[in-house]
């Protein structure tokens, strides 16, 4: 019952983000989410792209053109795979450095959130207690109405409506009171966030990290260049084969027109 009341209160008053905050004791880091999303996205593009190429080659036009796109797509896929393998350690190093350099900021923000959470918990407990009291009072008022059901259904319906409206009004008052208390902490959170942003802007670590990030990106570019050159060399035979095939088709079409 306690979990249900807290869930209703949080979703009703603060939205899904607050619910997420309460539910995730050890949320996945932002960097892990970015890396996982990129991996899933690239794999999805590769799989869906191959499906489209396969459908095109199976069509009448694809059979007439005979471009061998599927074979070339597999070649391209293996080339991109090698590129990912070569860049993997470099990007992993970049994300690790970024996470390490911003660890102090995440710790400070987590402290602020935990502090607000602890201050809000007594109000949530109070709301739960009032919720239980109102539900029990509602049940007691409904209990005698059950015996009157066989006597007068319309009269019972009227009583039910009155009791339901009274219960709704009481819970609305309790919810408004809880929302007002949460509003105070929302203002505090905004002030804390503004203060943290000011600290971040003027923090020597951030200025130092800007230089480090530039160095990391420069290193990433230098290490990625050989892999990108390899990708370009792998693509050239594919592009040349397509170009030769298309030019051959154009020449053949010209001959037929001139004949």
Curated annotation (Swiss-Prot):
Sequence repeats lie at residues 67-88, 89-110, 111-121, 122-143, 144-161, 162-183, 184-203, 204-225, 226-236, 237-259. Glycosylated. Palmitoylated. One of its GO terms (molecular function) is lipase inhibitor activity. One of its GO terms (cellular component) is discoidal high-density lipoprotein particle. Residues 67-259 are annotated as: 10 X approximate tandem repeats. GO terms for biological process: acylglycerol homeostasis; adrenal gland development; amyloid-beta formation; animal organ regeneration; blood vessel endothelial cell migration; cellular response to lipoprotein particle stimulus; cholesterol biosynthetic process; cholesterol efflux. Pfam families: Apolipoprotein. It comes from the Eukaryota. It is found in: Secreted. The modification Methionine sulfoxide is found at residues 109, 189, 236. InterPro entries: ApoA_E (IPR000074), Apolipoprotein_A1/A4/E (IPR050163). Participates in the reverse transport of cholesterol from tissues to the liver for excretion by promoting cholesterol efflux from tissues and by acting as a cofactor for the lecithin cholesterol acyltransferase (LCAT). As part of the SPAP complex, activates spermatozoa motility. PANTHER family: APOLIPOPROTEIN, APOLIPOPROTEIN A-I. Homodimer. Interacts with APOA1BP and CLU. Component of a sperm activating protein complex (SPAP), consisting of APOA1, an immunoglobulin heavy chain, an immunoglobulin light chain and albumin. Interacts with NDRG1. Interacts with SCGB3A2. Interacts with NAXE and YJEFN3. Belongs to the apolipoprotein A1/A4/E family. This is Apolipoprotein A-I. It comes from Rattus norvegicus.
């Amino acid at each position: 019952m306690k979990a249900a009341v807290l869930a209703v209160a949080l979703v009703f008053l603060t939205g899904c983000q607050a619910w997420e905050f309460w539910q995730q004791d050890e949320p996945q880091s932002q960097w892990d989410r970015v890396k996982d999303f990129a991996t899933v996205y690239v794999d999805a593009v590769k799989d869906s792209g191959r499906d489209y190429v396969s459908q095109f080659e199976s069509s009448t036009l694809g059979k007439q053109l005979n471009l061998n796109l599927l074979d070339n797509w597999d070649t391209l896929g293996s080339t991109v795979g090698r590129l990912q393998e070569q860049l993997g350690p470099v990007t992993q190093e970049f994300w690790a450095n970024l996470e390490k350099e911003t660890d102090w900021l995440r710790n400070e923000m987590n402290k602020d959130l935990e502090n607000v959470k602890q201050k809000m918990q007594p109000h949530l407990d109070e709301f739960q207690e009032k919720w239980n009291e109102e539900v029990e009072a509602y049940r007691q008022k409904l209990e005698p109405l059950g015996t009157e059901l066989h006597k007068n259904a319309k009269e019972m319906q009227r009583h039910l409506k009155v009791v339901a409206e009274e219960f709704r009004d009481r819970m609305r008052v309790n919810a408004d009171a809880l929302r007002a208390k949460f509003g105070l902490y929302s203002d505090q959170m905004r002030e804390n966030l503004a203060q943290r942003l000011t600290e971040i802007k003027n923090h020597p670590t951030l200025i130092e990290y800007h230089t480090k990030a530039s160095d990391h990106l420069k290193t990433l570019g230098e290490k990625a260049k050989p892999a990108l050159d390899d990708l370009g060399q792998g693509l050239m035979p594919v592009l040349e084969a397509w170009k030769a095939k298309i030019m051959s088709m154009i020449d053949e079409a010209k001959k037929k027109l001139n004949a």
